[in-house]
């Protein structure tokens, strides 16, 4: 049976060789250094994440170890281990005595199980013992001010059993097997105070219109206001990739979001092709939104031209756009009479759920007879309400609303609403209308225009 440590080294070197063949770096030494630094960073990040979870659970992930013995093979063996948890095989009563574990092995006759090395998951848990000394403060292994056992010269022969100081040895512990993604913390209130400016690229009118159309239905940019969308489009950079070029690599950190202008891109997960995308499609959004590795490898199936948006610009524009939209809508909603019964918290949730739509003079916002799916609040501009039976009914302006009747009673639109000039409306879908408006729905029912002589006011 091969040595586990040797097998681990062999696997790592094999993986490194595959990476070198795949990416063909010019500077092999630097590539190898970056490769192992990235692996080390990921391992340490996971280790300290587990430590934080353990502390939150009241568990000492780094129990103190006074001495280690060295066996005849030169392997350090921990004596007097002080585990931070008790045997899972004992009585279920959490207050019972767990000191005796009938399944525990004699460490004197099974020293190999207690060997420490080759990673945090290869140490003996010694679950039969419970901690007798209080845990001491954790030590950062990277702190140069702290002594390390690795820096002590080996002054004893391999056959001697001597005691040497040892740094704290982490207990293998998985506080929570479920993993999650996260994003860097950015404080939107401080964004206005720094000097950061988004990049601006000189695009032709045709290019701007094409990119705006491509972004129109993208779920990340759909909620941005007009100014934020213009900022995104102006910041896009054109990148060209030859056929068979790896655009993004599965497992790498996300750096760019891409929109395909021309060509075809194939996507692979674990070397298996899963899909393809072509002109007008986009990819790479999630790795920019969240601090998580790329979920797939993207390879240019043909010569490809893409528009790319870098991570910092992506995060800043989205965050600022969302933050500014919330502030604007919260102020706007406070002035609408029918919404004054909402609490500040409910108003904030409603502000986050609203979407902005723009219409030009003559555009029909809703049409008589159509099925209603949205509720509308007029932010600016003027609208005319009319139907075939009564003709012009009334005009609506800033702060007015329409479309509620079709959602409350699940009826077709009772009238057409047309923009008299440039109009900006905030829209709320049917599910959000029922979920977020709460007591306001009852008020709207009381104001049901079908109860009056004007059956079209609710549209």
UniProtKB/Swiss-Prot annotation:
Pfam families: cNMP_binding, RIIa. 3',5'-cyclic AMP 2 binds at residues 338-454. CDD domains: CAP_ED (cd00038), DD_R_ScPKA-like (cd12098). InterPro entries: cAMP-dep_PK_reg_su-like, cAMP_dep_PK_reg_su, cAMP_dep_PK_reg_su_I/II_a/b, cNMP-bd_CS, cNMP-bd_dom, cNMP-bd_dom_sf, RmlC-like_jellyroll. One of its GO terms (molecular function) is cAMP-dependent protein kinase regulator activity. 3',5'-cyclic AMP 1 binds at residues 220-335. It comes from the Eukaryota. SMART domains: cNMP (SM00100), RIIa (SM00394). One of its GO terms (cellular component) is plasma membrane. Residues 146-168 have a biased composition (Low complexity). Tetramer, composed of 2 regulatory (R) and 2 catalytic (C) subunits. In the presence of cAMP it dissociates into 2 active monomeric C subunits and an R dimer. This is cAMP-dependent protein kinase regulatory subunit. It comes from Candida albicans (strain SC5314 / ATCC MYA-2876). The gene is BCY1.
